[in-house]
Amino acid sequence: MAAPEERELSQEQTEKLLQFQDLTGIESMDQCRQTLQQHNWNIEAAVQDRLNEQEGVPSVFNTTPNRPLQVNTADHRVYSYVVSRPQPRGLLGWGYYLIMLPFRITYYTLLDIFRFAVRFIRPDPRSRVTDPVGDVVSFIQLFEEKYGRIHPVFYQGTYSQALNDAKQELRFLLVYLHGEDHQDSDDFCRNTLCIPEVTNFLNSRMLFWACSTNKPEGFRVSQALRENTYPFLAMIMLKDRRMTVVGRLEGLIQPQDLINQLTFIVEANQTYLVSERLEREERNQTQVLRQQQDEAYLASLRADQEKERKKKEKQEQKRREEEEAQLKQMLEERKKRNLEEEKERKSECLPAEPVPDHPDNVKIIFKMPNGTRVERRFLFTQSLSVIHDFLFSLKETPEKFQIVTNFPRRVLPCLPSEEIPVPPTLQEAGLSQSQLLFVQDLTDD
């Protein structure tokens, strides 16, 4: 499988990458980038996780799974390396061995019978795990009190947390089960595990989790891994999508031999991690691509929805404008019809035009707003409202108007008002027998 092409980093990501390298001292730029990507480029989270890793503390950003991760211990491809105790040498050695053999057999037989009988009387208290983190921390404290502080970085968390972090970070996890009652445990811890070469090797290549089988958490792990003797080491990694035991080391192993055996296990199984890392990167890129496609689809959908919304708004606005135009036209037509009916009613109510030789005749010439002239006779005794009604009844007369004399210019009070409740007669208004009046349009005022 070819490695997918790495995406180019933005300027902000490049700055975070360099800052993370300065803070952590990691020389590999690829490792820095991978760590930041695992934390979504959150530099504070990545630095804190790196510090936790150096101290063996589980990641505070990786929550513990609700169910413990299952470990495949039945893989037939598990590499097993057992160190047998050295055979007796010489006549004296064999003699001592043969003399002590019956006592050893008797001791271990009686011990097994005693433990078996005790289980019927009182259940093994180690079977109840109440504080797994406390069990691990307590073992680490006792280990440092007995063997000093020069040792591999212990993972300060539960076995399940260690499995989860190893799975998430695609790293090897070395599990050490400490048998306090075994005769080789003290020698292994003092002369193998705490040797600087071994310590540096483990710290740089894998996570390291350890606990005593006398602790409930260690006993629980012991029941799962089923060791045969002590010291016991198990190498666990993500293989075929499962956390799998790929190596078992049992017995008192020497420092260089331990490094060689672990190196062999790592190199034999490194391809699985590389393959899983490539698949994970491919899945991440596929997920990113799918997310980008989803975002593009949502953006397109929102654009279409916005376009449809604007279209509906435009249609709704057009519909309202058409309705308003229709309503306005209907009101104008009704107003026009009412005006025509009012003009017709005023025309029917007008008194008849007096004969030309009537002594009270007043001949008035009206100059209309459109420039035309209208002539009619009225009586001096008639009210100015008659003049107004006559002009109102004409088709060319605007809806609102006023009547003005020429000289001196004054507006004739043809309609009732608060000052003049009853309009005066033509004579009272001072009109002469032959009069020119102007009709002014007030429609726009």
From Swiss-Prot:
Region described as Disordered: spans on this chain: 303-354
Example GO biological process: stress granule disassembly
Subcellular location: Cytoplasm; Lipid droplet; Endoplasmic reticulum
Pfam families documented for this protein: FAF1 (PF21021), UBA_8 (PF22566), UBX (PF00789)
Domain UBA: 12-53
Positions in coiled-coil regions: 275-353
Name under which the protein is recorded: FAS-associated factor 2
Principal location class: cytoplasm
Domain UBX: 357-439
PANTHER family: FAS-ASSOCIATED FACTOR 2 (PTHR23322:SF1), FAS-ASSOCIATED PROTEIN (PTHR23322)
UniProt keyword annotation of Endoplasmic reticulum present: yes
Key words of the record: Coiled coil, Cytoplasm, Endoplasmic reticulum, Lipid droplet
Keyword Endoplasmic reticulum: yes
Recorded GO CC terms: endoplasmic reticulum; lipid droplet
Compositionally biased region (Basic and acidic residues): 303-348
Known role: Plays an important role in endoplasmic reticulum-associated degradation (ERAD) that mediates ubiquitin-dependent degradation of misfolded endoplasmic reticulum proteins. Involved in inhibition of lipid droplet degradation. Involved in stress granule disassembly.
GO MF annotations, alphabetized: protein-macromolecule adaptor activity
